[in-house]
Amino acid sequence: MSNYTTTNRFAFLPGTIIFEPGTSKDYRELERHHYRIRPPRTWAYICVARFVPRGKRSPGRLVAVGVLSWPIAMHKTRMVHFNLPTDYGTNARFANENLRTISRVIVHPQFRAIGLAREIVRRLIEACPTPYVEASAVMGRFAKFFTSAGMVQIDSDPEKPAYFLYDKQSEQA
């Protein structure tokens, strides 16, 4: 994945959306717009979207950020889906070798409902070095950007956060 990309998907805007790798500083700039108070516990990769108005050459205004994190070792829905035993060591090894977790997707309120979250998720999936990308989100049952980015919602307890999985190996089939 290149360090700087754009897409025609947002051609209706009076400027350009630029996607590039980000930093934890970028995350902190938008974190107040997320429903979870604490930042992610780990950071494997950060993707940001910046809006540059037509005719400007500035770095652009930060409008979205997504964080790819190292997975937690024990996740019940994952264990059931992959038929994993309940011991910590096996789960930790499987998770670290095969998964990364999309832990945050934040879009500035002025730029919501135009597909930026879906595009950030797609780019996090593309940047991920592992065969699987997962996400677990309380709002996932209502905000459909994970499924519109190609992730599959795995049935889980309706009282728990929704669980999503993307199998990068299925792209090659």
Where are the regions that the model predicts?
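Terminal substrate-recognition subdomain of acyl/acetyltransferases
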Residues: 1-104, 125-173
